[in-house]
């Protein structure tokens, strides 16, 4: 599957403008221009979706993950099926958005989506199967919870084994596909909420601030408190810290 040029659907392009509540009489010219530019940008982000539609697929799911890099917390994946006329101004790769913007967009994506699902794999299992396999399992769980069942998958970089649905892994897909961008936002927002909830269950680590990433604050709390059930013991420096504790050694986290 390859798409180099935007595959605009002119009828849908016009319908979005005509039907959108954003285009009400009296809207300022600057806002109108912004929204028109967003229509064009988002239609361009649908190029892979349109190619799949043109090949006879009706339900196309975008899939992405959040939380592969942290040393604590689950890896989470989201799967989203959007309609052909989906329009959500501001949608983009979640990494390019503020937390507040992501939260607002997530609510709108859930409102407009045909179906959406989020799944998680926690460290107790992640450490047994490795982060790549844990990511795949979270993605598979998210896909299986969609209804209707998707007929085609657009996935950010990862190939999913053991699933009888046609798929296309797209490098940097969260910047190239509107469906993957939507999934990236949902996965990130839901994971952040999970880590904020765990902050009260495991006080002192600062999970609500760093979300499990290896910040200096987090590493200092590890030295002070030791590990908790959320920490990934297969990830460094947690692995060395756990091994050091077993043999009476103190890891040098800041060398």
Swiss-Prot record:
Catalytic reaction equation(s): Endonucleolytic cleavage to 5'-phosphomonoester
Subcellular location: Cytoplasm
Cofactor binding note of this UniProt entry: Manganese or magnesium. Binds 1 divalent metal ion per monomer in the absence of substrate. May bind a second metal ion after substrate binding.
UniProt key word Lipid metabolism: no
Main localization, broad class: cytoplasm
GO molecular function list: manganese ion binding; RNA binding; RNA-DNA hybrid ribonuclease activity
Gene Ontology, cellular component aspect: cytoplasm; ribonuclease H2 complex
UniProt entry tagged with the keyword Transmembrane: no
Enzyme class: hydrolase
The protein's required cofactors: Mn(2+); Mg(2+)
Pfam families linked to this entry: RNase_HII
Keyword entries, A-Z: Cytoplasm, Endonuclease, Hydrolase, Manganese, Metal-binding, Nuclease
GO biological process terms held by the UniProt record: DNA replication, removal of RNA primer; mismatch repair
Domain RNase H type-2 residues, every copy: 58-247
Family matches, as InterPro entries: RNase_HII, RNase_HII/HIII, RNase_HII/HIII_dom, RNaseH-like_sf, RNaseH_sf
Enzyme Commission numbers on file: 3.1.26.4
Binding-site residues, a divalent metal cation: 64-65, 156
HAMAP family: RNase_HII_B
Function: Endonuclease that specifically degrades the RNA of RNA-DNA hybrids.
Family: Belongs to the RNase HII family.
Protein name: Ribonuclease HII
Organism: Syntrophomonas wolfei subsp. wolfei (strain DSM 2245B / Goettingen)
């Amino acid at each position: 599957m390859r798409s180099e040029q935007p595959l605009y659907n002119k009828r849908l392009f016009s319908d979005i403008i005509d039907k959108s509540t954003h285009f009400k009489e009296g809207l300022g010219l600057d806002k109108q221009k912004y929204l028109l530019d967003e229509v064009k940008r988002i239609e361009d982000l649908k190029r892979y979706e349109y190619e799949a539609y043109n090949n006879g697929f009706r339900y196309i799911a975008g899939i992405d993950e959040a939380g592969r890099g942290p040393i604590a917390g689950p890896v989470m994946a989201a799967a989203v099926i959007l309609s052909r006329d989906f329009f959500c101004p501001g949608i983009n790769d979640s990494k390019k958005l503020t937390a507040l913007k992501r939260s607002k967009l997530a609510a709108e994506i859930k409102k407009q989506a045909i179906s959406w699902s989020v799944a998680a794999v926690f460290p107790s299992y992640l450490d047994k199967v490795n982060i790549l396999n844990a990511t795949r399992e979270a993605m598979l769980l998210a896909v299986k919870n969609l209804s209707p069942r998707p007929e085609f998958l657009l996935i950010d970089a990862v190939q999913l084994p053991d699933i009888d649905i046609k798929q296309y892994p797209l490098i940097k897909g969260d910047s190239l596909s509107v469906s993957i961008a939507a999934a990236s936002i949902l996965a990130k927002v839901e994971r952040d909420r999970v880590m904020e909830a765990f902050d009260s269950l495991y006080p002192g680590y600062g999970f609500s601030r760093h979300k499990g990433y290896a910040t200096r604050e987090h590493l200092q709390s590890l030295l002070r408190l030791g590990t908790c059930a959320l920490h990934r013991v297969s990830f460094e420096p947690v692995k060395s810290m756990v091994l050091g504790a077993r043999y009476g050694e103190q890891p040098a986290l800041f060398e």
